[in-house]
């Protein structure tokens, strides 16, 4: 009986073609098998056109030997660099830990190294030595003992007692709570005797100065009153002050007014200093750090103050020298064009300037003071209406006896600083700032007294600065008396408007 099912006949060469493309796919391992099979058969058709006489089996065999082997070599060369890169990446990643045990996995381990630092930093005190040697600075910065970056105990380290810390260093704990407690009063006051310390946060390593030192700069912008006792004819002022420069470390004043200075004819060595809590310990300055300033005073005619010059602060060990530089001093007065009388002014500047007045030119030796100023002024007063009136002097309590008349005038001073080491060489400041002063003139018989005050006096008719005990009136020299007799004074009917 004949079967009705059709028989499938496999064409010749189909098995050979399928085996060839399968071997090529297994050998090359392409990413896209369909596209690779299409390229395979296209290349096989092109290869057959050049070899038409070959059988299908021989054709596939030669095609594999020529074409497929080249394809496999090319893919192998391309895969080799990729494998090398994968191996390198794998080796780099393998160096980092991929697992962490829960017993050692704490919050401190998850913090990066640069972001976490538990070290104690100590900084030297600014008041101990302002100028440090370059070799000592790294040693002072590294004075704190380092601690491990990841301590086993979670509790912060206890801060040492303030007594165990040196006077030149301030302990700054890394823990915010301990730092706040230490700043609130666990350490000694910075105003105590010889225990001045400067608290600097770990995050801010910039050296800073205390507010007491910076408060002295605020007084420079204020007006300064200079009470002066002068004769009715001609006034020639000469101020001499010898003192060592020091800066008070007391509390900052609430207002802009500073403590007024006093005048005395005796040197500063004979006077007693304020209490120790109000100022830093005084140490005499050496001769190599003296600063000499020259002042030239001249009269002007307009009522507008010419303000120029600048003040600078020179820091030296345990002292801060605040000399005035580049100021123009002049008397606001309608001055007649008469021959001026030169007046030499040697003044030592300090936080509390003590000056004695003389009408003669005086020479000051350099060893008396660390800062000197020399000035020349041309001052002419012709007000005979005040002649014959007694002088006015304030008593010890601050009240004044109104005996003479007072006239305010504005004074502007110009300073040029000279260092004694450089003879004849001026160190002039490029910029200039202004300092306006008010002068009150009080009639006196035959003497003139000028008191430089650091207080801010805004009213010309205010109470004058008290004159301390021991204020003497110097006598006129013969040269000055001769100059007065040559007619430098106007007639009695003419008055000078100040």
From Swiss-Prot:
InterPro entries: CABYR (IPR038848), cAMP_dep_PK_reg_su_I/II_a/b (IPR003117), DD_CABYR_SP17 (IPR047579). It holds the Pfam family RIIa. Residues 12-49 form the RIIa domain. GO terms for cellular component: cytoplasm; cytoskeleton; sperm fibrous sheath; sperm principal piece. Residues 74-107, 135-164, 247-279 are annotated as: Disordered. This is Calcium-binding tyrosine phosphorylation-regulated protein. SMART domains: RIIa. It comes from Vulpes vulpes. Its main location: cytoplasm. The gene is CABYR. Residues 145-164 have a biased composition (Low complexity). GO terms for molecular function: calcium ion binding. On the 2D-gel the determined pI of this protein is: 4.3 to 4.6, its MW is: 97 kDa. Phosphorylated on tyrosine residues during in vitro capacitation. Dephosphorylation affects its ability to bind calcium. Expressed in testis. It comes from the Eukaryota. Interacts with FSCB. One of its GO terms (biological process) is sperm capacitation. Keywords: Calcium, Cell projection, Cilium, Cytoplasm, Cytoskeleton, Flagellum, Metal-binding, Phosphoprotein. It is found in: Cytoplasm; Cytoplasm, Cytoskeleton; Cell projection, Cilium, Flagellum. May function as a regulator of both motility- and head-associated functions such as capacitation and the acrosome reaction. Binds calcium in vitro.
């Amino acid at each position: 009986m004949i079967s009705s099912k059709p028989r499938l006949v496999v064409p010749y060469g189909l098995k050979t073609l399928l085996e060839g493309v399968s071997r090529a796919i297994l050998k090359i391992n392409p990413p896209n098998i369909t596209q690779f099979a299409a390229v395979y058969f296209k290349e096989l058709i092109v290869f057959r056109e050049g070899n038409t006489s070959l059988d299908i089996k021989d054709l596939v065999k030669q095609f594999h030997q020529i074409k497929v082997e080249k394809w496999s070599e090319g893919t192998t060369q391309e895969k080799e660099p990729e494998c090398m890169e994968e191996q390198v990446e794998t080796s780099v990643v393998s160096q980092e830990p991929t697992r962490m045990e829960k017993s050692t996995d704490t919050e401190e381990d998850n913090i990066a190294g640069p972001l976490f630092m538990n070290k104690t930093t100590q900084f030297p005190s600014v008041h101990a030595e302002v100028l440090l040697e370059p070799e000592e600075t790294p040693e002072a910065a590294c004075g704190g003992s380092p601690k491990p970056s990841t301590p086993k105990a979670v509790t912060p380290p206890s801060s040492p007692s303030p007594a165990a810390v040196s006077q030149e260093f301030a302990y700054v704990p890394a823990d915010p709570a301990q730092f706040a407690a230490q700043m609130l009063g666990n350490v000694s006051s910075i105003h105590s005797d010889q225990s001045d310390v400067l608290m600097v946060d770990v995050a801010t390593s910039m050296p800073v100065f205390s507010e007491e030192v910076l408060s002295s700069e605020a007084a420079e912008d204020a007006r300064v009153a200079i009470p002066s006792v002068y004769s009715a004819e001609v006034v020639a002022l000469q101020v001499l002050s010898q003192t060592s420069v020091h800066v008070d470390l007391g509390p900052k004043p609430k207002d802009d007014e500073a403590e007024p200075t006093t005048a005395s004819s005796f040197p500063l060595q004979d006077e007693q200093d304020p209490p120790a809590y109000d100022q830093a310990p005084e140490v005499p300055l050496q001769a190599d750090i003296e600063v000499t300033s020259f002042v030239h005073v001249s009269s002007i005619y307009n009522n507008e103050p010419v303000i120029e010059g600048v003040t600078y602060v020179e820091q030296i060990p345990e002292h801060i020298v605040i000399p005035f530089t580049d100021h123009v001093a002049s008397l606001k007065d309608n001055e007649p064009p008469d021959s001026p009388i030169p007046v030499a002014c040697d003044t030592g500047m300090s936080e509390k300037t003590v000056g004695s007045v003389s009408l003669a030119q005086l020479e000051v030796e350099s060893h008396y003071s660390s800062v000197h100023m020399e000035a020349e002024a041309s001052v002419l007063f012709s007000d005979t209406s005040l002649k014959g009136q007694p002088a006015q002097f304030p008593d010890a309590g601050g009240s004044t006896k109104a005996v003479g008349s007072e006239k305010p005038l504005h004074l502007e001073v110009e300073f040029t600083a000279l260092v004694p080491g450089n003879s004849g060489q001026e160190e002039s400041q490029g910029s200039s700032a202004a300092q306006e002063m008010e002068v009150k003139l009080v009639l006196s018989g035959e003497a003139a007294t000028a008191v430089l005050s650091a207080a801010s006096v805004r009213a010309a008719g205010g109470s004058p600065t008290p004159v301390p005990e021991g204020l003497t009136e110097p006598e006129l020299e013969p040269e000055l008396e001769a100059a007065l007799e040559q007619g430098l004074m106007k007639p009695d009917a003419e008055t000078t408007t100040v």
